């Protein structure tokens, strides 16, 4: 399971011109399930995200988590994180989980996130989405659970 985590001042996801998910300060999480991923990987990814200390404390050091600041999580499915371009210029997505399994793992992750954190918004799995964000920093962290 892979994720790109961006610290944001705000973020939202629109589908067909309608906002379907939005947060203020917090984390935008672009999430990708890969072949062979399991629920335990999603659990570890969520635990890492909730405790990741990438928000500034009073001294300006990255020492606070999204939980510490009461921030939001905006979780967006992003199968293209599984792209492989080693064989040419056109990406291959064969490492991405099959659509049914990808959806199941995404839904599992979102369900667990909502149980663990009070502010969780989402995009829509498999939809054509427009993601709008105000990157804070910018701070962008790639995560991978194996």
Curated annotation (Swiss-Prot):
InterPro entries: Daa-tRNA_deacyls_DTD, DTD-like_sf. It is found in: Cytoplasm. SUPFAM superfamilies: DTD-like (SSF69500). CDD domains: Dtyr_deacylase. A motif (Gly-cisPro motif, important for rejection of L-amino acids) lies at residues 137-138. GO terms for biological process: D-amino acid catabolic process. Transmembrane segments: none annotated. Gene3D superfamilies: D-tyrosyl-tRNA(Tyr) deacylase. Its EC number is 3.1.1.96. Keywords: Cytoplasm, Hydrolase, RNA-binding, tRNA-binding. Belongs to the DTD family. A Gly-cisPro motif from one monomer fits into the active site of the other monomer to allow specific chiral rejection of L-amino acids. NCBIfam families: D-aminoacyl-tRNA deacylase. Homodimer. PANTHER family: D-AMINOACYL-TRNA DEACYLASE 1, D-TYROSYL-TRNA TYR DEACYLASE. An aminoacyl-tRNA editing enzyme that deacylates mischarged D-aminoacyl-tRNAs. Also deacylates mischarged glycyl-tRNA(Ala), protecting cells against glycine mischarging by AlaRS. Acts via tRNA-based rather than protein-based catalysis; rejects L-amino acids rather than detecting D-amino acids in the active site. By recycling D-aminoacyl-tRNA to D-amino acids and free tRNA molecules, this enzyme counteracts the toxicity associated with the formation of D-aminoacyl-tRNA entities in vivo and helps enforce protein L-homochirality. This is D-aminoacyl-tRNA deacylase. The gene is dtd.
């Amino acid at each position: 399971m892979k994720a790109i985590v961006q610290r944001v001042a705000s973020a939202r996801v629109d589908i067909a011109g309608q906002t379907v998910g939005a947060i203020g300060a917090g984390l935008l999480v672009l999430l990708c399930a890969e072949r062979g991923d399991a629920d335990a990987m999603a659990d570890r990814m969520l635990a890492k995200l909730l405790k990741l200390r990438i928000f500034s404390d009073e001294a300006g050091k990255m020492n606070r988590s999204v939980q510490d600041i009461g921030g939001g999580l905006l979780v967006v499915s992003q199968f293209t994180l599984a792209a492989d371009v080693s064989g040419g210029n056109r990406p291959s997505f064969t490492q991405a989980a099959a659509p049914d399994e990808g959806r199941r793992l995404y839904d599992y992750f979102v369900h667990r996130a909502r149980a663990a954190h009070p502010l969780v918004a989402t995009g829509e799995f498999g939809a054509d989405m427009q993601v709008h964000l105000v990157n804070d920093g910018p701070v962008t962290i790639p995560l991978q659970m194996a």
